[in-house]
Amino acid sequence: MKERGLELSPEKTKITHIDEGFDFLGFNARKYGGKLLIKPAKKGIKSFLDDIRGTVKSMRAVKTENLIKYLNVKIQGWVNYYRHCVAKATFNYLDNSIFWIVWKWGKRRHQNRGASWVRKRYYTTLGLRKWCFYSKVKAGKQESRILLTLAQHTKIERHVKVRAEASPYDPDFKEYFIKREREKMRKKNDSRVI
């Protein structure tokens, strides 16, 4: 490494056993029972929930519609970053935590009202889900609803490894890389259509 002009910083370098795991770029890599799993790091989850709490507390007086729009952008961005790792349980935990944060927001906003009144005002039933945080939105004469995004509804997509022998410069693998690119574009377009 020294030939290339690279040095390891002792403060930033940590050598650890894979069974203990390590955090890197918001992910935690660790072996569980002989199988390597990459999950969102606990520090990243805590930081995200603290950010959501701070956002909700600072937006006490805003319209519900604006709060939902703001939270949806944050939730979707965070979830898209972690959608390629083992994150389903984390997404469920986030949804549960955000539910209680938003519930407290509604209760704090209407301190003289009961829980059932707050539920009727801010929550609706959608299919089998009985507690969907929502707001009515008026656009001209039409009225629609905006719902809080649930992290658990995001599809986990695993990274497909490139074949070891495949090279984009080898004409024999031209069709293979065209097919990979098509699949990548299809997934990208599918995620936009909701």
Where do the PLM segments sit?
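Non-catalytic terminal/accessory segments
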Residues: 1-194
